[in-house]
Amino acid sequence: MSKLQIIQSKGQYINGEWIKGNGLILESTNPASGTLLWQGNNATDEEITHACYIAHCALKSWANTSFEERARYTIAFVEQVEKNRDQLARLISLETGKPLWESQTEVSSVIGKVNLSIQAYQERTWPKQTETAEANACLRFKPHGVVVVLGAFNFPAHLSNGHIVPALLAGNTVLYKPSEHTPAVAELIIQCWHNSGLPPGVINCLQGNANCGNTLLSQDIQGVYFTGSYATGLRIHQQFCNRPEVILALEMGGNNPLVIDEVKDINAAVYHTMLSTMITAGQRCTCARRIIIPDSQTGDLFLERFAKACKLMRIGSFDSQPEPFIGPVINHVQALKHLHAQKQLIEIGGEIILPMSLLVEYTGLISPGIIDMTRAKNPPDEEIFAPFAQIYRYNHFDEAIQLANQTRYGLSAGLLSDNKDHYLQFYQHIRAGLINWNRPTTGAASSLPFGGVGCSGNHRPSAYFAADYCAYPVASMEQPLLTTPAQRLPGLVLE
């Protein structure tokens, strides 16, 4: 990539304006080539503090705006995304390495999120009124105030959008810090908000690394909406242990199980397992990390075909022809980290079936890997965010469920089975927020809640239930005329 093709940052977006940043240099690279893609600056402490002040200044007017008008701004945002659909999809692919077909799907999710969020708000946080003998019992909802959205790199447009849109609909103002790996995508999304006519200060974007995030979280804020690793989510939780008034919505991934039963259609099982483990180069929080297979001829045949499918899978840059199924992981550093994790599993007794390896130096391009952990000693309960599957064998279905539940996480779990009774048993005993039957573990719908239990979250599911953490309920007993009740309580004397 030549110097001329590097995207120069617009700056920090504060109070409806792009302001040239004064912080340390921040850069993002194309993970498929390792070349520089975008260059800008980390937000300074002063810029972050100023943005928070601006968000508070904009809050009263925005919160007092009618829901219908706030919804119109989100619809105008969608129209801007539609106009920039191709540019946004290409930028997602350039900055994350995703194949173009997957980036186009992400853009469609961004567009579809708005109407679903409007519907969810009207269903879950709409005012209600009940007449009683003494007064009107009213339920209404108010915004929390200024909320922080911390973006993730794997879906740089869609996941942040899933917090931002419900927050704005509820009347909050937003401080948005994208992932430091995907600042270019964030700038285009914010430009779409700007072009929608959204009032200044309602959304502000601050680019930066983890230090910027820490500074942002120390501000006068009323909510934090986060998608990312358990380690980071735990630090956020600990940071707010003395600030219980700040609402936290934490989505933190999982060590997700996929159980293969004695199925008839082995190829179907392989297909859904590929989509569960390898899609997005294994960088979805719902990806299956542990594949639990029967210790039988069916299990052997499944594993043989699964390994073959992984070998034949096309991997490459988003613009490669023929089109790849997956691209790279987010950068070279993460690729090396995943290879080190594979080495550690081998050292505790894991048996390599298909080694994960670096395909191109100084990039995030790695081949898919499969390791049999059945005889390993004390395997770590960690999420390896890569195209990497760990195999565990079982002798009876009860054992499969027991193995599936051997995790502190609880985001997604799946069963591939022709036996409905087995699914009912699986559903009854599995501890997870998303439980799928004969579908990939990565299959989710924005019309449903999205979140996990255990170390996967803090019981604040997003997607359709995001409205719940973007506003708080206010209960009121109301009577338009001040009167003395006909029957007074004993012991009270009035003149």
Curated annotation (Swiss-Prot):
NAD(+) binds at G228, S229, Y230, A231, T232, G233. PANTHER family: ALDEHYDE DEHYDROGENASE-RELATED. This is N-succinylglutamate 5-semialdehyde dehydrogenase. Keywords: Arginine metabolism, NAD, Oxidoreductase. Belongs to the aldehyde dehydrogenase family. AstD subfamily. Catalyzes the NAD-dependent reduction of succinylglutamate semialdehyde into succinylglutamate. It catalyses: N-succinyl-L-glutamate 5-semialdehyde + NAD(+) + H2O = N-succinyl-L-glutamate + NADH + 2 H(+). Pathway: Amino-acid degradation; L-arginine degradation via AST pathway; L-glutamate and succinate from L-arginine: step 4/5. The active site is at E251, C285. HAMAP family: Aldedh_AstD. Its EC number is 1.2.1.71. GO terms for molecular function: succinylglutamate-semialdehyde dehydrogenase activity. It is an enzyme of class 1 (oxidoreductase). GO terms for biological process: arginine catabolic process to glutamate; arginine catabolic process to succinate.
